[in-house]
Amino acid sequence: MAINAQEISALIKKQIENFQPNFDVTETGVVTYIGDGIARARGLDNAMSGELLEFSNGAFGMAQNLESNDVGIIILGEFSTIREGDVVKRTGKIMEVPVGEALIGRVVNPLGQPVDGLGDIATTGFRPVEAVAPGVMQRKSVSEPLQTGLKAIDALVPIGRGQRELIIGDRQTGKTSVAIDAILNQKGQDMICIYVAIGQKESTVRTQVETLRRYGALDYTIVVTASASQPSPLLFIAPYAGVAMAEEFMYQGKHVLIVYDDLSKQAVAYRELSLLLRRPPGREAYPGDVFYLHSRLLERSAKVSDDLGGGSITALPFIETQAGDISAYIATNVISITDGQIFLQESLFNSGIRPAIDAGSSVSRVGGSAQIKAMKKVAGTLRLDLASYRELEAFTQFGSDLDAATQAKLNRGRRTVEILKQPLHKPLPVEKQVVILYALTHGFLDDVPVNDILAFEEALYDYFDMHYSHLFETIRTTKDLPEEKDLDDAIKAFKDQANFN
């Protein structure tokens, strides 16, 4: 049998042309140190800052310290099975989280994995956890109100869509309750809410989730949780994961409310990571970039321009103070970043004034532009009235005789304090807030005993719902007050048939 050299040559050439190389080139390194959620690895010379790295046990890490001879890595998950000498490889991808509507109604960890036992989440999109905030020309000024349903906030420290309003106070002063009530009040307001629980007890998070479910608020809410028992890298990354999920909706032209509960615990987790990564400590052992930790997070909340869809992210970050000290390091940092703060005072809370908002120390830098006309008219003098009442109340401790004008101010002040009280998880629509504040500022409550104020308020709402619902409708649709005569007549008619004098 003759061998045809040309055929063999053609066959070999064809095989060479059709050859598909089947191999992967990955840059790998070796773990040189492991402990406390931190790893160090040699050999990853081209790793990027914030890059996702994969360990041989399947766990993922994030490159943080890029040094001349090794890389400092924070481990996002189980690290007890990682050993020195294990292989760690680059993925070539920056840390991302799943985003999209499929997350709504679910409880997830900072990596976007479900922790509520309701099965997998069919998300299709991803966004990087670290992203550049919208620039100056990509933003619009805050002009639309975000109604929290709490009279003390909507009247005294109004919040607008796209604003960052800090909620600050000692532990157990009702910070979480304020945020949960604000989420409950977004029902039917075309708003998506994200509640980020950082370093909370798992039982506490479960309670908040059940509250949201009971009031039907979980239908438009995503809960991101990094509990106290989880490694500090997850606590550090949780707020960034939450805001990445929010940005997806914002750039689709939707409105988002995001609650960070609380950033003090994130700062402590970041301090822990930084010290373990051997970064130089600064004041109170926090690293030098702890301001940037929070500023780059909160700057991502904005009201974006119409060219970008006109969506918004409104942020309610929490800071926990020690003994009411709002001049502490992290507290002053976040106060300077945000557009105002709501200060909750322990003494007010313990004396039964809830929400325990200190009107003197609380401020909204957006102010009246985030209020409807009707609220602006009825709440205009409320803050001054409250401040002068507090001042006069301090003087009356000395028991001096009071003239009629001073007595009238004190009486009005006591009724103002009562009106601003509100039961837990009972947010009020803005039209009801406007009517009761109108009744207060126009003297209709001056002859009602202080102990009967809350009963008077409930009865007034019921009476208006039955007989004057068109006045509520007018406020809701026009955002302005109805004719003063109509309101006066309606309140007088209620007082004539009710026995509160």
UniProtKB/Swiss-Prot annotation:
ATP binds at G169, D170, R171, Q172, T173, G174, K175, T176. Its EC number is 7.1.2.2. Gene3D superfamilies: 2.40.30.20, ATP synthase alpha/beta chain, C-terminal domain, P-loop containing nucleotide triphosphate hydrolases. It is an enzyme of class 7 (translocase). InterPro entries: ATP_synth_asu-like_sf (IPR023366), ATP_synth_asu_C (IPR000793), ATP_synth_asu_C_sf (IPR038376), ATP_synth_F1_a_nt-bd_dom (IPR033732), ATP_synth_F1_asu (IPR005294), ATPase_F1/V1/A1_a/bsu_N (IPR004100), ATPase_F1/V1/A1_a/bsu_N_sf (IPR036121), ATPase_F1/V1/A1_a/bsu_nucl-bd (IPR000194). Signal peptide: none annotated. Its main location: membrane. It is found in: Cell membrane. It is a peripheral membrane protein. It catalyses: ATP + H2O + 4 H(+)(in) = ADP + phosphate + 5 H(+)(out). CDD domains: ATP-synt_F1_alpha_C, ATP-synt_F1_alpha_N, F1-ATPase_alpha_CD. One of its GO terms (molecular function) is ATP binding. Pfam families: ATP-synt_ab, ATP-synt_ab_C, ATP-synt_ab_N. Keywords: ATP synthesis, ATP-binding, Cell membrane, CF(1), Hydrogen ion transport, Ion transport, Membrane, Nucleotide-binding, Translocase, Transport. One of its GO terms (cellular component) is proton-transporting ATP synthase complex. The record marks S362 as: Required for activity. SUPFAM superfamilies: C-terminal domain of alpha and beta subunits of F1 ATP synthase (SSF47917), N-terminal domain of alpha and beta subunits of F1 ATP synthase (SSF50615), P-loop containing nucleoside triphosphate hydrolases (SSF52540). Belongs to the ATPase alpha/beta chains family. Produces ATP from ADP in the presence of a proton gradient across the membrane. The alpha chain is a regulatory subunit. F-type ATPases have 2 components, CF(1) - the catalytic core - and CF(0) - the membrane proton channel. CF(1) has five subunits: alpha(3), beta(3), gamma(1), delta(1), epsilon(1). CF(0) has three main subunits: a(1), b(2) and c(9-12). The alpha and beta chains form an alternating ring which encloses part of the gamma chain. CF(1) is attached to CF(0) by a central stalk formed by the gamma and epsilon chains, while a peripheral stalk is formed by the delta and b chains. This is ATP synthase subunit alpha. It comes from Streptococcus uberis (strain ATCC BAA-854 / 0140J).
